[in-house]
Design a protein with these regions (language model features):
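Iron-sulfur-associated redox domains of electron-transfer enzymes in respiratory
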Residues: 1-124
C-alpha cells in the first residue's frame, strides 16, 4: 500500500486559494487505511472548506484512486458540478488519475505521499 500523511489544512487552503467551489475525491483503499482519505476525512475536509467560505459542490470516494475506470465514474458527477477545483485525498498517483478525468479543472492533493509500505493497523 501507499502510505500517506495529511498536509496541514493551511497548506490545502493555500492550494485551493481563491476557488469558490470545490469538489472532494477520497480513496477507499490506501488513504482510508492511513486515515487520510476515507469517509470521515472527506467529511472533515468538507467542514473545514465550508468554514473557510468555500462551497463544496460534491464529494465521492473511489474504491481505488489509482484505478482509472473507477475514478472516471466517480469524477463524472463531480466534474458535472463545475467546481473551480478538486481536492483529492489520496496518494500522488490518485491525484494524477483524478486530473486525467477533470480536463481544465485544477486538481490538488490534500496528502503527502510518503512511501510504499504496510500499515500496522488503521491510521498507523
Amino acid at each position: 500500500m501507499i502510505i500517506t500523511q495529511k498536509k496541514p489544512i493551511e497548506e490545502v487552503m493555500a492550494l485551493v486559494g481563491d476557488a469558490k467551489t470545490v469538489a472532494i475525491l477520497g480513496c477507499g483503499s490506501c488513504a482510508t487505511a492511513c486515515q487520510t482519505g476515507g469517509e470521515a476525512q472527506v467529511a472533515e475536509l468538507k467542514k473545514a472548506l465550508e468554514a473557510a467560505g468555500k462551497t463544496v459542490v460534491g464529494t465521492a470516494i473511489a474504491d481505488y484512486c489509482c484505478m482509472s475506470l473507477g475514478v472516471k465514474a466517480k469524477m463524472k458527477p463531480l466534474v458535472a458540478a463545475k467546481p473551480d477545483c478538486v481536492v483529492t485525498m489520496s496518494c500522488g498517483d490518485g491525484v494524477q488519475c483524478a486530473a486525467k478525468h477533470a480536463p481544465g479543472i485544477p486538481v490538488y492533493p490534500s496528502n503527502d505521499t510518503m512511501f510504499l509500505g504496510e500499515a500496522a493497523r488503521f491510521g498507523v
